[in-house]
């Protein structure tokens, strides 16, 4: 029986360690307090606050598609944004122009850009580079406009909250050269993994979950958060409200069947956790229960098979971001100019033969 318990706790530790290693970052998103991050209706429509201030975000709307001919179902959404913003520059980036942009301005990333298995990953990453290079507002093609976006231009960085937790990358506004986006593009090569399911691969490597992980780490930087706050738009400003800036049309098509299963698991995580432990115990019992004889007690040192995933030396990619950060506020303040997100990394990276 002692040996059965040993194997049980051994495999339990293995599973828990692997779970924390792979999903520790996303799990922590459920515990984020958004209170200080929210961009509310009263904030945006209080014209007295910003009547004498210049816009932080340039008047540019960016969208991406394979070619210049977008699907008919999104023409109305595109037209609504163009018609409401005659004084804005509108840019539709195609697959060809996106790759040319990366090859010309960020050649150090071109190999990684070409290696992504899904086109949506390239569409994800290029929006980060575009907003960093030019600034402006990025909108997915299924996002239409209900009203002028001028009030949002006074906020140097804003995104929208997504469900069940974290932020989305389908609607974003950033000032040119925003340091948060610099951290985003620097971390892209470190999150480039294939999770064998299209939805998970996209979400973790380039999509909203990846962006949320970087944002979560960014919020913990005293200097970065104080100087370059990222505002999170409340749902009332996004859709289904008379205050909403946007209207969502028929959605994108890259979500495969695994997406629905992932969302179902997220909404019923407690049940799946219980069933997982129950199944694991039953399997271990039937594999070892009748075959093993009572064994001597396992020493405590023999049970430490894996190092803690919370260790500072852990290779977990959810913690890789912290090599650029410090938790000491005084230390950060004395070296703010030399922090990676304050350095001119673009010029530096183009002279290097390897990814950052």
Curated annotation (Swiss-Prot):
Signal peptide: none annotated. Keywords: Endoplasmic reticulum, Glycoprotein, Glycosyltransferase, Golgi apparatus, Membrane, Phosphoprotein, Transferase, Transmembrane, Transmembrane helix. Gene3D superfamilies: 3.90.550.20. The modification Phosphoserine is found at residues 307, 353, 355. It holds the Pfam family Gly_transf_sug. One of its GO terms (biological process) is mannosyl-inositol phosphorylceramide biosynthetic process. GO terms for molecular function: mannosyltransferase activity. It is a multi-pass membrane protein. GO terms for cellular component: cis-Golgi network membrane; endoplasmic reticulum; endoplasmic reticulum membrane; Golgi apparatus; trans-Golgi network; trans-Golgi network membrane. It is found in: Endoplasmic reticulum membrane; Golgi apparatus, cis-Golgi network membrane; Golgi apparatus, trans-Golgi network membrane. Glycans are attached at residues 52, 146. Its main location: endoplasmic reticulum. The chain crosses the membrane at residues 4-24, 197-217, 269-289. It comes from the Eukaryota. It is an enzyme of class 2 (transferase). Its EC number is 2.4.-.-. With imt1 and imt2, is required for the synthesis of mannosylinositol phosphoceramide (MIPC). Catalyzes the addition of mannosyl to inositol phosphoceramide (IPC). MIPC is essential for cell morphology, cell-surface distribution of ergosterol, localization for plasma-membrane transporters, and lipid-raft-mediated endocytosis of plasma membrane proteins to the vacuole. Belongs to the glycosyltransferase 32 family. This is Inositol phosphoceramide mannosyltransferase 3. It comes from Schizosaccharomyces pombe (strain 972 / ATCC 24843). The lineage of its organism: Eukaryota, Fungi, Dikarya, Ascomycota, Taphrinomycotina.
């Amino acid at each position: 029986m002692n040996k059965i318990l040993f194997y049980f706790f051994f495999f339990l530790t293995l599973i828990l360690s692997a779970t924390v290693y792979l999903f520790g970052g996303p799990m922590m998103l459920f515990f984020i307090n958004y209170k200080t991050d929210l961009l509310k209706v009263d904030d945006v429509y209080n014209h007295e606050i910003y009547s004498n201030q210049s816009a932080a975000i340039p008047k540019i709307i960016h969208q991406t598609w394979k070619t210049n001919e977008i699907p008919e179902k999104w023409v109305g959404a595109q037209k609504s944004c163009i018609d409401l913003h005659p004084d804005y520059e509108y840019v539709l980036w195609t697959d060809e122009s996106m790759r040319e942009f990366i090859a010309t301005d960020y050649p150090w990333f071109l190999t990684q850009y070409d290696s992504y298995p899904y086109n949506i990953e390239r569409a994800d990453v290029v929006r980060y580079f575009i907003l960093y290079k030019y600034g402006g507002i990025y909108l997915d093609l299924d996002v239409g406009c209900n009203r002028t976006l001028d009030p949002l231009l006074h906020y140097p960085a804003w995104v929208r909250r997504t469900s069940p937790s974290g932020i989305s990358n389908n609607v974003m506004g950033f000032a040119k050269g925003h340091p948060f986006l610099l951290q985003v593009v620097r971390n892209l090569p470190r999150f480039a993994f294939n999770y064998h399911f299209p939805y998970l691969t996209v979400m973790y490597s380039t999509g909203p979950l990846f962006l949320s992980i970087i944002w979560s780490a960014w919020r913990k930087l005293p200097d970065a958060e104080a100087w370059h706050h990222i505002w999170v738009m409340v749902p009332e400003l996004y859709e289904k409200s008379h205050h909403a800036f946007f209207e969502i049309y028929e959605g994108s098509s890259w979500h495969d069947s695994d997406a629905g299963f992932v969302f179902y698991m997220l909404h019923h995580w407690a049940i799946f956790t219980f069933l997982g432990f129950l199944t694991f115990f039953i399997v271990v019992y039937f594999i070892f229960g009748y075959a093993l004889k009572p064994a001597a007690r396992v020493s405590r040192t023999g049970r430490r098979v894996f190092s803690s995933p919370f260790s500072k030396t852990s290779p977990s990619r959810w913690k890789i971001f912290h090599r650029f950060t410090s938790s000491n506020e005084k230390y950060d303040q004395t070296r703010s100019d030399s922090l990676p997100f304050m350095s001119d990394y673009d010029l530096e990276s183009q002279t290097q033969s390897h990814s950052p």
